[in-house]
Design a protein with these regions (language model features):
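ATP-dependent adenylate-forming carboxylate-activation enzymes
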Residues: 1-13, 26-32, 82-85, 217-221
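Short amphipathic alpha-helical segments
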Residues: 8-9, 38, 57-61, 125, ...
């Protein structure tokens, strides 16, 4: 409802390629046009990408009609850094995980777990790099991070920063609106890192959906696996290490739909993407999605030339 232009442009581009009626775009608020679609009796399949709260309503609407629904919902993904990680790759992955698209990504690496032995150095370097990120207008070549989608979302993010401070977290950098010059009237935020975070804090458990990362210290592989899985969500995540055996153990151990190893936010075509737990149902960007849009049918032909004999004449 707040980003109609891109899909309308896509519709314009494909209108001469696919038959009329195959692809339709309905704009409007989710509470009105979206709810109308949920209530309409003509749909035989529902799909939704968005918040877990709205996703539950979509699932209920599908259940009432006895039709399938695929849901790609919220996340609070774990970005895990072990002491043997490649330093430059790790710093790049930290920023890509939480600053890409201004943090407005369902699989954003918003819980940053850092091994105790490198924690202080990691935090110091991360703060330096976050403070160097160029926040600006999206059409400028030098801009690295643009604005939040609207003022309501910006205010929600800033409220979570305050919640974190009340819980005992420390704002290491950012946490404020960027208002310099031409940014003054926009919804621009400074890249934000929260330190002294524990995994039970609201800022570590609830989806903020913005450029805010919570840094959490851990000692052992077993400890970080337990914390990573102590979440209602399970959409994305990453592990940074030079030890392939550890990488595979952690990747397998985290209950999530996708785990990256030494990268983040790589979403290639052909690789299934979707969530576990409150992060959704079904997988996209892979041929398995076709199973959600089709129904298997069985036609059985009797090849026998005699009756069953169960009911003799």
């Amino acid at each position: 409802s707040t980003t109609p232009l891109s899909v309308l442009e896509f519709a314009r581009l494909v209108q001469d390629v696919i038959p009329a009626g195959v692809f339709n775009v309905i704009t409007g608020s989710g509470s009105k046009s979206g709810q109308y679609m949920l209530d309409h009796p003509g749909f035989r399949k529902l799909a939704f990408t968005g918040s877990t709260e709205v996703g539950r309503n979509v699932a209920l609407a599908a259940a009432q009609k006895l039709i399938p629904a695929t849901l790609e919902l919220g996340g609070k993904s774990a970005n895990i850094f072990f002491e043997d990680c490649d330093w430059e790759m790790a710093m790049d992955g930290l920023q890509m995980g939480i600053l890409f698209n201004q943090g407005q990504v369902c699989c954003a690496g918003s819980r940053v777990f850092v091994q105790e032995s490198i924690y202080d150095r990691f935090v110091e370097e991360a703060v330096k790099r976050f403070n160097k990120v160029k926040v600006g207008l999206p059409w400028k070549e030098e801009t690295q991070m643009g604005s939040q989608i609207d003022r309501r979302q910006m205010e929600k993010i800033l409220k979570y920063v305050e919640i974190g401070k009340e819980e005992g977290a420390k704002v290491l950098c950012g946490g404020v609106q960027a208002k310099e010059g031409e940014l003054e009237k926009g919804c621009f935020l400074r890249p934000t890192l929260l330190g002294d975070v524990t995994n039970d804090m609201r800022v570590a458990q609830e989806e903020i959906f913005g450029p805010v990362a919570c840094i959490i210290k851990f000692k052992t592989e077993e400890e970080v696996l337990a914390m990573a899985n102590d979440s209602a969500y399970g959409l994305g995540g990453a592990v940074w290490t030079r030890d392939i055996n550890r990488a595979l153990r952690v990747a397998r151990g985290v209950e999530t739909g996708r785990m990256w190893v030494n990268t983040y936010n790589a979403i290639p075509e052909g690789a299934p993407f979707g969530g576990c737990k409150a992060s959704g149902i079904g997988r996209e960007t892979h041929k398995v999605i076709l199973e959600h849009y089709t129904q298997m049918k069985n036609i059985m032909i009797n090849m026998a030339e005699a009756p069953t004999g169960f009911y003799p004449a």
